[in-house]
Swiss-Prot record:
Protein task: Catalyzes the reversible phosphorylation of UMP to UDP.
Location of the region described as Involved in allosteric activation by GTP in the Swiss-Prot/TrEMBL record: 20-25
Top-level taxon of origin: Bacteria
Gene responsible for this protein: pyrH
Species whose genome carries this gene: Listeria monocytogenes serovar 1/2a (strain ATCC BAA-679 / EGD-e)
UniProt-recorded name of the protein: Uridylate kinase
Length: 242
């Protein structure tokens, strides 16, 4: 049996990832593909927590640019992440993966409230835990939510599965054919060079808590989530303090 390099991981999925080529909304076939890959990882004995974005439905920053109150726009974005999380939970449970959604905003008729000790207990029992609603506060991204939850549950690594991007580049590879892909760099490099990996708040939080980040594409052939967990060098690794 393959031996994973990590025992407990936080998987960060963008909202756009759930939309697939549709660009908007939730594409059930894409969600099912992601769920099947996650199931393979769970079967390795890895404890999997997930943070999903909401950009396939709504972006708070866009609402703010349209003249909305930023806090209200961000709250709409939090609700979008909860919709995505419920979709992913349903897909996972349909293939036999026990899953719990925990929300940063109290809505007990729909999901559990986020309780750190309870989340860890779920993970220890082999359940997937999806952290929904971001941090529960406006002005904070779901990347920051992933960094925060990873620190709280003492995750070994944050896995950032990107849609059609296979790592971190010094320029947009879709626009610049000479863009250079990084194999490895530090959070300080990310912050100093303004690389579009995580926002500064998320990068600083991950750096301070020495949580490595691996950025990769899950749209390539095969299960890249599993490949990363088994130690295969794909994508870009962002180091913590070490």
């Amino acid at each position: 049996m393959d031996t994973p390099d990590y025992k407990r991981v936080v998987l960060k999925l963008s909202g756009e990832a759930l939309a697939g080529n549709d660009g908007f909304g939730i594409n059930p076939s894409v969600v099912n593909l992601i769920s099947a890959q996650i199931k393979e990882v769970v079967e390795l004995g890895v404890e999997v927590a997930i943070v999903v974005g909401g950009g396939n439905i709504w972006r708070g920053k866009l609402g703010s640019e349209m003249g909305m109150d930023r806090a209200a726009a961000d709250q709409m974005g939090m609700l979008a992440t909860i919709m995505n999380s419920l979709s992913l939970q349903d897909s996972l449970e349909n293939i036999g993966v026990a899953t719990r959604v925990q929300t940063s905003i109290d809505m007990r008729q729909i999901a559990e409230p986020y309780i750190r000790r309870k989340a860890i207990r779920h993970l220890e029992k082999g359940r997937v835990v999806i952290f929904a609603g971001g941090t529960g506060n406006p002005y904070f991204s779901t990347d920051t939510a992933a960094a925060l939850r990873a620190a709280e549950i003492e995750a070994d690594v944050i896995l950032m599965a990107k849609n059609n991007v296979d790592g971190v580049y010094n320029a947009d590879p879709k626009l610049d054919e000479n863009a250079k892909k990084y194999e490895e760099l530090s959070y300080l490099d990310v912050i100093k060079e303004g690389l579009e990996v995580m926002d500064t708040t998320a990068s600083s939080l991950s750096m301070d808590n020495d949580i490595p980040l691996i950025v990769f594409s899950f749209t390539e052939q095969g299960n890249n989530i599993k490949r990363v967990i088994l130690g295969e060098k794909i994508g870009t690794t962002v180091r913590g303090k070490k």
